[in-house]
Swiss-Prot record:
<dbReference type="GO" id="GO:0009228">
    <property type="term" value="P:thiamine biosynthetic process"/>
</dbReference>
<dbReference type="InterPro" id="IPR020826">
    <property type="entry name" value="Transketolase_BS"/>
</dbReference>
<feature type="binding site">
    <location>
        <position position="174"/>
    </location>
    <ligand>
        <name>Mg(2+)</name>
    </ligand>
</feature>
<dbReference type="Pfam" id="PF02779">
    <property type="entry name" value="Transket_pyr"/>
</dbReference>
<feature type="binding site">
    <location>
        <position position="370"/>
    </location>
    <ligand>
        <name>thiamine diphosphate</name>
    </ligand>
</feature>
<keyword id="KW-0460">Magnesium</keyword>
<dbReference type="GO" id="GO:0052865">
    <property type="term" value="P:1-deoxy-D-xylulose 5-phosphate biosynthetic process"/>
</dbReference>
<comment type="similarity">
    <text>Belongs to the transketolase family. DXPS subfamily.</text>
</comment>
<comment type="subunit">
    <text>Homodimer.</text>
</comment>
<dbReference type="Pfam" id="PF02780">
    <property type="entry name" value="Transketolase_C"/>
</dbReference>
<dbReference type="InterPro" id="IPR005475">
    <property type="entry name" value="Transketolase-like_Pyr-bd"/>
</dbReference>
<feature type="binding site">
    <location>
        <begin position="145"/>
        <end position="146"/>
    </location>
    <ligand>
        <name>thiamine diphosphate</name>
    </ligand>
</feature>
<protein>
    <recommendedName>
        <fullName>1-deoxy-D-xylulose-5-phosphate synthase</fullName>
        <ecNumber>2.2.1.7</ecNumber>
    </recommendedName>
</protein>
<dbReference type="GO" id="GO:0019288">
    <property type="term" value="P:isopentenyl diphosphate biosynthetic process, methylerythritol 4-phosphate pathway"/>
</dbReference>
<dbReference type="GO" id="GO:0016114">
    <property type="term" value="P:terpenoid biosynthetic process"/>
</dbReference>
<dbReference type="InterPro" id="IPR029061">
    <property type="entry name" value="THDP-binding"/>
</dbReference>
<dbReference type="Pfam" id="PF13292">
    <property type="entry name" value="DXP_synthase_N"/>
</dbReference>
Length: 636
């Protein structure tokens, strides 16, 4: 059987180990070819090929349900559930999503994108099953990185108190999340992994007995119960934490040995209560470049399979916002020992790996624990430090209560630096940074700012570190504009003060962050049609520069706002609230992301679909304020 013939995972039933190994080879081949062409997560999926095949051979997927944590390791799952022939559309607009979506396939039982949710979801399904008198298996597959998240531990704590609830947790332990794992739990799991001498001892004894002339086979057969007893004794000791929490612990199992995996899963299915099977895997298995550099090959842009190197850009690009952030913060930290960078398992993605290498004592990785990261920062701020929490916009959502309760109510000087703010592209709705302006703007004592380019990002970093209270800066994914970057001597910005970039009499355009340059381009297009616009770089969404904005709005009488975020509660809402508070009844056109989920596509495709290109925005402005001539029509 070829992988291309598999449309249902139950087709794996009855296949030999040799046949499964052949399909595993085909999965890796398709996985590598596709990600090399489209980009996507590479290492996670390569590491769970055998785990997926063995698990699915022992389940009835017409009835049983598997929940994959995060979902970026579920590419083999997608290939085994009828998506082989359109797998080339992975992460492309209108194609297969990079994560799991309930609307995409009937075997995607729970959508995700953020970590540590799988055990809670699978336990919920198990309890629903029992409440309705049904009988099927519920399985959560979770990585050791995700297991550091508090929600996963909360779910384990709950499940362990339900001895009659049948639940299987498969711990995919590759000693990595995106970067190497941190913390006591990770250290404990690593001790379990290195306890493999027990496995080696029993296997060695078996091989030795087989070589005894005449009686070796019989002795070996008789030794099997002893061998299993030795293993169980070892397991009960090394898995003590999980046993004490109410789980039957099995493992560690070689995650690339199909025979051992199948036997272990079949044994696990016999238990009636919660079971944890500990599977030791290698991230990036089967592709040497990914095995050697597990951080770099966690996820990749399109690359050359033969060399493992990214396909060269057509022309040199400016440094990314993340890199500018990391380099600038490191320079500032060298002269200010109060500065400490905090990440929740995203050092490389946020640029904090630069600080980690240069000043390791001023760097903290808390693991996948956003709530802890925020309160840790609050505690450090209480005692004179200047913590900088570097985090993706989408992940700060997970610590919303802590931002309010532990930082803002106490007005502590914690600096939130929100990478990937706005449209992020192929990762889709779970990763879009759409909501931070709205959900942070409503919190008293919080200051919000966003740079128009990478040079202003440097100045805002100085501003945030100097400010004596809660403050947040958002900046987008990807490369900067390409403006000159001074290496030192950055000046802070006055809090709540905007910048006028262009003078005009017909229209007031107020832009925030990454939308400043598109607003300037829009103004140029409007100017060609006889409309002159004043363009303001707001810099701050809270507090607004009302001393500048309100008189201009009163004078010009027509206002357009620009933001790369959700319109409900966002920057445009802040402007309209301000004008209303000053009794100004002027027409306002807010431009941004409407009340919808932005699906996976390239950032440019998403902006086109949302009407956020300069030409589209100019057309909307002309339509709003009475002109019948459209920019697009005029340029056609």
């Amino acid at each position: 059987m070829h992988l291309s013939e598999i449309t249902h995972p139950n087709q794996l039933h009855g296949l030999s180990v040799a046949q499964l190994e052949q399909i595993g080879h085909q999965i890796r081949e398709k996985h590598l070819q596709t990600v090399a062409a489209t980009g996507g997560h590479l290492g996670p999926g390569l590491g769970v090929v055998e785990l997926t095949l063995a698990l699915y051979q022992t389940l009835d997927l017409d009835r049983d349900k598997v929940v994959w944590d995060v979902g970026h390791q579920a590419y083999p799952h997608k290939l085994l559930t009828g998506r082989y022939h359109n797998f080339h559309t992975l992460r492309q607009k209108d194609g297969i999503a990079g994560y799991l979506k309930r609307t995409e396939n009937r075997f995607d039982h729970f959508g995700a994108g953020h970590a540590s949710t799988s055990i809670s979801a699978a336990l919920g399904m198990a309890l629903a099953r029992d409440a309705q008198g049904e009988d099927y298996r519920c399985v959560a597959v979770i990585g050791d990185g995700s297991l550091t998240g508090g929600m996963a531990l909360e779910a384990i704590n709950h499940a362990g108190h339900l001895p009659k609830t049948r639940l299987l947790v498969v711990l995919n332990d590759n000693d990595m999340s995106i970067s190497p794992n941190v913390g006591a739990l990770s250290r404990y799991l690593n001790k379990i992994r290195v306890s493999e001498p027990m496995q080696l001892l029993t296997d060695g004894l078996t091989q030795g007995m087989q070589q005894i002339p005449f009686v070796g086979g019989a002795i070996t057969q008789g030794f099997e119960p002893v061998k299993e007893g030795m293993k169980r004794l070892s397991y009960s000791k090394i898995g003590a934490v999980f046993e004490e929490l109410g789980f039957t612990y099995m493992g560690p199992v070689d995650g690339h040995n199909l025979e051992e995996l199948i036997a272990t899963f079949r044994e696990a299915h016999k238990h009636t209560g919660p079971v944890l099977v500990h599977v030791a895997t290698t991230k990036g298995k089967g592709y040497p470049y990914a095995e050697e550099d597990q951080v770099g090959y966690h996820a990749q842009n399109p690359f050359d399979l033969a060399t493992g190197k990214a396909k060269p850009a057509s022309k040199p690009k400016p440094p990314s916002h993340s890199k500018v952030f990391g380099q600038t913060l490191t320079t500032l930290a060298k002269s200010d020992r109060r500065i400490v960078g905090i990440t929740a398992a995203m050092a490389t993605g946020t640029g904090l790996d630069i600080l980690q290498k240069a000043l390791p004592k001023q760097y903290i990785d808390v693991g996948i624990a956003e709530q802890h990261a925020v309160v840790l920062a609050a505690g450090m701020a209480c005692d004179g430090m200047r913590p900088v929490v570097a985090i993706y916009s989408t992940f700060l959502q997970r610590a919303f209560d802590q931002v309010i309760h532990d930082v803002c109510i106490q007005k502590l000087p914690v600096f939130f630096c929100l990478d990937r703010a706005g449209i992020v592209g192929a990762d889709g709705p779970t990763h879009q940074g759409m909501y931070d302006i709205a959900y942070l703007r409503l919190i008293p004592n919080m200051v919000l700012m966003a740079p128009k380019d990478e040079a202003e990002l440097q100045r805002m970093l100085v501003t945030g570190i100097e400010y004596d209270g809660p403050i947040a800066m958002r900046f987008p994914r990807g490369n900067g504009i390409g403006v000159p970057l001074p290496e030192e001597g950055w000046e802070s910005l006055p809090i709540g003060k905007a910048e006028q970039l262009r003078q005009g009499d017909d229209l007031l355009m107020l832009a925030y962050g990454s939308m400043v340059y598109p607003a300037l381009q829009t103004a140029e297009l409007l100017n060609e049609h006889g409309i002159s616009a004043t363009v303001i770089n707001a810099r701050f969404a809270k507090p607004l520069d009302e001393e500048l904005i309100v008189p201009l709005a009163r004078q010009i009488g027509k206002v357009v706002t620009f933001e790369e975020g959700c319109l409900p509660g966002g920057f445009g809402s802040a402007i309209m609230e301000s004008l209303q508070a000053h009794d100004l009844q002027v027409p306002v056109l807010p431009i941004g992301v409407p009340d919808l989920l932005v699906e996976h596509a390239s950032p440019d495709e998403s902006k086109q679909e949302l009407g956020l290109t300069p030409r589209q925005m100019a057309d909307r402005i002309l339509e709003k304020f009475g002109s019948r001539q459209r920019i697009g029509a005029a340029s056609a």
